[in-house]
Design a protein with these regions (language model features):
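Sequence context of c-type cytochrome heme-c attachment sites
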Residues: 48, 70-72
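Short cysteine-rich clusters marking metal-coordination/redox-active sites
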Residues: 60-63, 88-91
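Juxtamembrane/disordered regions of integral membrane proteins
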Residues: 137-212
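Short, flexible, mixed-charge glycine/proline-rich loop motifs
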Residues: 47-57, 77-83
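Short, intrinsically disordered terminal segments enriched in charged and Pro/Gly residues
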Residues: 1-50, 101-148, 204-205, 209-210
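Short linker/helix segments within small regulatory modules
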Residues: 74-85, 99-104
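Cys/His-rich microdomains that often coordinate metals
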Residues: 66-69, 94-95
């Protein structure tokens, strides 16, 4: 698909935020267990004065429709369980998604276990998707970082990331009871979490410009 670069900012793996999603090992949990995915290509309307959340779009390469980015959200119950990609409610195809590097490594190593039933699992997954998108509402979705929401979201991110590191560290031989690890995890929760939340608040409250 071709996009008007004067109208849209195009997000691919080359964008630093998307690259963070690919390289952050903690996000493998989101993909493998929760089924949270992000598309290979997403768009931001630079000409709209609306907040970022309301001017982000996901293009379907199959039917070429631009979906409102809020189509896949926790409020609609569609943010998770997208293990095989993002389902397009318009044409019924699957919008290609990026994959976290750690997720890729885990899937490669465990392929002999799940490879046998991948095709049948995907078919069952596809059959369940139309019902999930029958009554979605995008206009009612609010920015979770709005007001003081960034504090809650920030601490939530810090706590979840710390828990994932507590699982990951022993695997690579790091003592989770060492002073250095404890200080690191507390800093991640008390400093990194709120900082992450505030940065996301600023990002989601950005508006475009009609002059763009």
């Amino acid at each position: 698909m071709n996009f008007d670069k004067n109208k849209y900012k195009i997000y691919t793996w080359k964008n630093w935020m998307v690259l963070h999603y690919i390289l952050n090992p903690g996000l493998a949990f989101n993909e493998l267990i929760l089924g949270q995915r992000i598309p290979k290509v997403s768009l931001e309307d630079k000409t709209s004065e609306k907040p970022f959340l309301e001017r982000s779009y996901v293009p379907c390469p199959h039917c070429e429709i631009l979906h409102d980015g809020r189509t896949w959200s926790t409020q609609n119950g569609t943010a998770f369980r997208n293990w095989f990609g993002l389902y397009c409610p318009n044409c019924g195809e699957v919008i290609p998604c990026l994959m976290n590097l750690t997720t890729s490594l885990i899937l490669i190593i465990t392929f002999p276990v799940w490879g046998w039933f991948k095709k049948s699992s995907k078919q069952r997954w596809l059959e369940k998707q139309p019902a999930r998108y029958k009554e979605i509402e995008v206009d009612q979705i609010e920015n979770p970082f709005e007001g003081y929401g960034w504090i809650k979201e920030g601490f939530g991110w810090g706590i979840l990331t710390s828990l994932l590191l507590l699982i990951f560290f022993p695997i690579i031989g790091i003592d989770i009871f060492s002073r250095q690890v404890i200080v690191t995890l507390l800093s991640l929760i008390l400093v990194g979490g709120p900082l992450f939340g505030f940065i996301m608040k600023l990002f989601f409250e950005q508006t475009g410009s009609k002059a763009a």
